[in-house]
């Protein structure tokens, strides 16, 4: 039951194709289209070119300086790494630096029982990195897992530290992706895009995470602290620690604001001879700006802080009394910034005026899945062994976090690790006034990250936000530690992008073999676009011919298709 209107339309279409074949039947090819040009956009990502890691032992025997008294026993030790130079060569990099160490010790050879000693051990380590060249830039992170100082005899010590070095070089990768097809003449003339006749296009949006090249900087914390009124003047600084905590960053336009706190502990010999030792534990605020010409407020930061080796000097106040502490601590920064980008690309195209061939290339890219930060609270009760002096008062506590196991599981990352604590305290024994206690607190934690899979990769950072140590009695203390664990998670994605187009005259022989009108039954997974492309027509023509209001079709739908030829 075909209506008169439909019959009339079919007759006109059939007549058109009959006349078309009769007119052009003796021509091998037809081509009346406008020359076309593929408009390209470049996807730029920074990826790891090569990386390498080593764990090594830094050790040496060091003599006690002649100006220092004999060592009876070591109370506390501290070490830090300082990198001075990174040299790139073919397939390897060489890291130069020094291990700086400091120790507190007791001596019976002097009127004062507590003394200190400092020193440094230079090192040069080679890390193999395949594909590295001498023109690359290497970023190196490091960690001092353990620093032990043992007494050989009263005039010599053995320093032994386990250090890890993790180096990587990045490479900028670019992918050209077709975003449109326009008239070649218009493109050369700088005119607005002109759509060639008979060209049909489909677009899609791809979302990827664009990253800036990794860069380095140093944020120097400088401040002056004045002793409280109840504290005596300083004669000699014996020992100090400076630890940044609760560091926060905020991206501004072309700069980064850094805030937080600096925990400061100093043990010193006062000018007052009646008091043989004094200490101060305090905090000072951190607030500063680091310039960065590649960041903006909309970006997502990935900033790693690596505290360097600080310095503390005493200087006189306005009254000439030694009551001002001048402190400086460098924070080595490794920075990378991420930005989510939505790029409209040309997904597919064909022409009813010419033969259009598309060259496609598969590309892979990263998508930022999530950046999250968790707080972990751990606690334990610690008892010194019987050989240690009984605790009179706790001076300070420091610690480090060590992740031993990490595994991606369903909707999260499972972590296992320890918090290693080093506690300095005043004893009940005046002959041995200082003691230290080492303790290890294990912990487990599950970071909930919806949608994470084993194929994804992530970057993990751990920091200690707070340490609280209180005495329960002279033989037991309670330690509470607040940890901050942050993760930035990436997932891989991919698609095919059009990189080149090639146009040629239409093949008349092929067109002649195609029927002018086709009755088509929609099958599974068929789209109006695919049907139109296969049968030399357009989605708009199919919709008009079949009275459709949208491109949505369903299996079993019956369609009439009319062949379309443009550019004649």
Regions found by a protein language model. Name each.
Residues 1-3:
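Detector for intrinsically disordered, low-structure N-terminal pre-sequences
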Residues 5-35:
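Short, Lys/Arg-enriched N-terminal segments with co-localized hydrophobic residues
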Residues 8-10, 14, 18, 178, ...:
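Acidic/proline-rich low-complexity IDRs
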Residues 11-13, 19, 23, 103, ...:
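Generic low-complexity, intrinsically disordered sequence content enriched
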Residues 32-512:
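Interfacial loop/beta elements and low-complexity acidic/Ser/Thr-rich segments
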Residues 506-544, 549-568:
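Primarily a LysM-type cell-wall glycan-binding module
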């Amino acid at each position: 039951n075909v209506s008169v209107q439909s019959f009339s339309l079919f007759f006109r279409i059939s007549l058109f194709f009959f006349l078309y074949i009769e007119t052009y039947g003796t021509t091998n090819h037809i081509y009346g289209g406008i020359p076309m040009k593929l408009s390209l956009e470049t996807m730029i990502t920074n990826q790891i070119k090569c990386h390498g890691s080593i764990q090594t032992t830094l050790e040496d025997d060091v003599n006690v300086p002649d100006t220092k008294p004999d060592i009876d026993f070591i109370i506390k030790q501290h070490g830090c790494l300082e990198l001075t130079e990174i040299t790139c060569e073919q397939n390897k990099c060489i890291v130069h630096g020094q291990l700086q160490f400091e120790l507190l010790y007791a001596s019976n050879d002097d009127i004062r029982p507590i003394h200190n000693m400092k020193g440094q051990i230079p090192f040069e380590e080679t890390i193999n990195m395949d594909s590295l060249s001498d023109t690359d830039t290497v970023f190196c992170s490091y960690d001092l897992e353990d620093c032990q100082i043992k007494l050989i005899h009263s005039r010599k010590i053995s320093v032994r530290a386990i250090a890890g070095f993790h180096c990587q070089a990045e490479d900028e990768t670019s992918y050209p992706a077709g975003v449109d097809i326009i008239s070649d003449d218009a493109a050369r003339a700088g005119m607005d895009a002109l759509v060639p006749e008979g060209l049909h296009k489909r677009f899609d949006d791809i979302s990827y995470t664009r990253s800036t090249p990794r860069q380095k900087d140093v944020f120097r914390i400088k401040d002056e602290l004045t002793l409280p009124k109840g504290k005596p003047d300083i004669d000699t600084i014996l020992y100090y620690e400076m630890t940044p905590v609760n560091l926060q960053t905020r991206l501004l336009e072309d700069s980064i604001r850094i805030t937080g706190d600096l925990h400061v502990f100093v043990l010193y010999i006062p000018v007052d001879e009646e008091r043989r030792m004094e200490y101060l534990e305090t905090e000072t605020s951190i607030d500063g700006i680091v310039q960065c010409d590649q960041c903006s407020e909309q970006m997502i930061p990935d900033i790693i802080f690596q505290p360097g080796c600080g310095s503390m000097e005493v200087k006189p106040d306005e009254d000439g009394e030694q009551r001002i502490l001048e402190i400086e601590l460098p924070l080595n920064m490794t920075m990378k910034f991420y930005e989510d980008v939505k790029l409209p690309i040309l997904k597919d195209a064909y022409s009813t005026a010419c033969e259009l061939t598309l060259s496609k290339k598969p590309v892979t890219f990263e998508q930022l899945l999530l950046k999250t930060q968790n707080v972990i609270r751990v606690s334990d009760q610690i008892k010194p062994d019987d050989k240690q002096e009984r605790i009179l008062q706790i001076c300070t506590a420091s610690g480090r976090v060590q992740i031993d196991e990490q595994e991606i599981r369903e909707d999260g990352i499972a972590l296992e690790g320890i918090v290693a604590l080093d506690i300095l305290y005043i004893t009940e024994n005046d002959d041995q006034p200082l003691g230290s206690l080492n303790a290890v607190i294990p912990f487990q934690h599950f970071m909930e990250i919806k949608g994470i899979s084993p194929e994804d990769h992530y970057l993990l950072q751990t920091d200690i936000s707070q340490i609280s140590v209180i005495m329960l009695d002279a033989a037991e203390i309670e330690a509470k530690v607040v940890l901050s664990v942050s993760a930035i998670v990436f997932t891989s994605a991919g698609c095919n992008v059009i990189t080149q187009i090639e146009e040629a005259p239409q093949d008349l022989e092929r067109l002649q073999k195609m029927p002018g009108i086709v009755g088509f039954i929609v099958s599974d997974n068929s789209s109006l676009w695919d049907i139109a492309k296969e049968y030399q027509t357009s989605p708009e023509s199919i919709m008009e011919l079949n009275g459709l209001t949208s491109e949505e079709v369903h299996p079993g739908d019956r369609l009439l298709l009319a062949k379309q030829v443009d550019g004649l």
